[in-house]
UniProtKB/Swiss-Prot annotation:
Ranges facing Mitochondrial matrix side: 46-59
Catalytic activity: 4 Fe(II)-[cytochrome c] + O2 + 8 H(+)(in) = 4 Fe(III)-[cytochrome c] + 2 H2O + 4 H(+)(out)
Gene (UniProt): MT-CO2
GO MF, one example: cytochrome-c oxidase activity
Annotated organism of origin: Bison bison
Superkingdom classification of source: Eukaryota
Subunit architecture: Component of the cytochrome c oxidase (complex IV, CIV), a multisubunit enzyme composed of 14 subunits. The complex is composed of a catalytic core of 3 subunits MT-CO1, MT-CO2 and MT-CO3, encoded in the mitochondrial DNA, and 11 supernumerary subunits COX4I, COX5A, COX5B, COX6A, COX6B, COX6C, COX7A, COX7B, COX7C, COX8 and NDUFA4, which are encoded in the nuclear genome.
Membrane-topology annotation of the record: Multi-pass membrane protein
Coiled coil, from the record: none
Keyword Ribonucleoprotein: no
Protein name: Cytochrome c oxidase subunit 2
Cofactor: Cu cation
Entry annotated with the keyword Transport: yes
Entry-linked CDD domains: CcO_II_C
Amino acid sequence: MAYPMQLGFQDATSPIMEELLHFHDHTLMIVFLISSLVLYIISLMLTTKLTHTSTMDAQEVETIWTILPAIILILIALPSLRILYMMDEINNPFLTVKAMGHQWYWSYEYTDYEDLSFDSYMIPTSELKPGELRLLEVDNRVVLPMEMTIRMLVSSEDVLHSWAVPSLGLKTDAIPGRLNQTTLMSTRPGLYYGQCSEICGSNHSFMPIVLELVPLKYFEKWSASML
């Protein structure tokens, strides 16, 4: 989860988020090099009197500043497209969970089970226990097995919402009348927090998401106790 004065991303917990972090660092390096070059040229122009007032054309320079940006864009676009296709790929999900957005709570349905569904509301600040997080805790957590491919179906009952868990690299819009899907897989157990990421009314800030990723045997015990 995020913490005060944090400058970077949350720790990656899924393969997709790890790829996104690598892509961020890759792109940031390119942007840093371009910015350094531009600042160097500007400082050179301001501190020297070297000019080329007699130059009418420079085919070599024009060729370079046409080809070089194209190469840079390709270096950014190729890994970006790779990650985009990885995020859309769904292969043999172990479990399917449907998340429905409401004003202002989430409801979940485990579609592989006959009767396993519940609503998830934020716990008010006055009811928090010691050690619990303000505005992030819910009364019913989404319990999922770790190291398994989970398919999430996301929609809404009323207005636009967005189901987002940053540490897993997830953000899927919840649109009324439309069913969007995404996949998640956690590489380690733990609690992972998210929030609605689409302004949806006065209580938009009070729609937290809590995923509890556990080993498969504990998930089976939990699902049996919920039926």
